[in-house]
């Protein structure tokens, strides 16, 4: 392949860290704008930036600081990257199951709330933590389920959560091996089982964490799954933001067409 595949110009990234100076994401507004320009050039047209926020601090001064920094970024983006529709939500760390999450401004849109478990570790009572979100009227969207330590040994959790209505949002970087072999293995298992609802970049506005959503689209398309790529990076994220259900995604082998043919030959199948 000599160049990038022709992706649609309507990719939707619902998890990234571009609000400057508030978490481990972008450091400055200029940095964030530069990354938004690169997003635009790769076909992304909708971005929800999701800085970290602990459930125990949803009403504190830290959230006010985040919102102030976001407004500065929004103004700059309106002038310099008008092609991108930018909005603010949060990656809500569930550190307090009793936290009041009634403020609709916390959500991604459409009644969906992006959540994560603390410290990238599968907690002792994950179902209770997720139900504390859904019990307050939200549709939980679990950030990078493939990355939590111990999830590979407790994969049945993913199946159970999906049955309970939790949306599985996988990092593109996990499929590409950026988060280590275990996260890649679980992400590929989820993809093969049809347990991935959406992909997102989890871009952190700096070179060390700069995996883009377009990279995920390209990787799937290169493996012969452009239709699946469209669902995971465009149609399903857009539906989620509108409060509509995600389309079911069939199980997908991320191996290249050549590798698949070789496997069939080894098994004695026809090409």
Regions found by a protein language model. Name each.
Residues 195-211:
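Short acidic/histidine-rich active-site segments
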Residues 40, 134, 191-192:
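Non-catalytic positions within long, well-ordered alpha-helices that form the structural scaffold/packing
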């Amino acid at each position: 392949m000599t160049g990038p595949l022709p992706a649609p110009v309507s990719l939707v990234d619902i998890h990234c860290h571009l609000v400057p100076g508030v978490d481990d994401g972008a450091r400055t507004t200029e940095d964030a704008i530069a990354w938004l320009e690169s997003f635009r050039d790769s076909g992304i047209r909708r971005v929800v930036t999701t800085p970290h926020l602990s459930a125990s601090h949803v009403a504190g001064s830290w959230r006010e600081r985040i919102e102030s920094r976001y407004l500065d970024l929004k103004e700059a983006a309106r002038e310099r990257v008008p092609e991108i529709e930018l909005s603010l939500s949060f990656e809500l760390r569930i550190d307090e199951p009793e936290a009041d999450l009634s403020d609709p401004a916390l959500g991604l849109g459409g009644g969906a709330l992006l959540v994560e478990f603390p410290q990238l570790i599968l907690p002792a009572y994950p179902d209770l933590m997720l139900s504390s979100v859904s019990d307050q009227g939200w549709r939980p969207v679990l950030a990078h389920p493939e990355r939590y330590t111990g999830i590979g040994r407790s994969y049945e959790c993913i199946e159970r959560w999906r049955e309970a209505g939790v949306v599985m949002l996988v990092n593109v970087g996990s499929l590409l091996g950026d988060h280590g072999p275990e996260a890649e293995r679980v992400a590929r298992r989820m993809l093969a089982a049809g347990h991935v609802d959406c992909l997102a970049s989890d871009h952190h506005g700096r070179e060390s964490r700069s995996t883009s959503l377009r990279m995920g689209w390209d990787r799937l398309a290169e493996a012969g799954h452009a239709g699946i790529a469209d669902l995971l990076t465009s149609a399903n994220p857009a539906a989620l933001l509108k409060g509509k259900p995600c389309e079911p995604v069939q199980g997908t082998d991320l191996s290249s067409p050549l590798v698949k043919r070789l496997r069939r030959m080894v098994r004695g199948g026809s090409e």
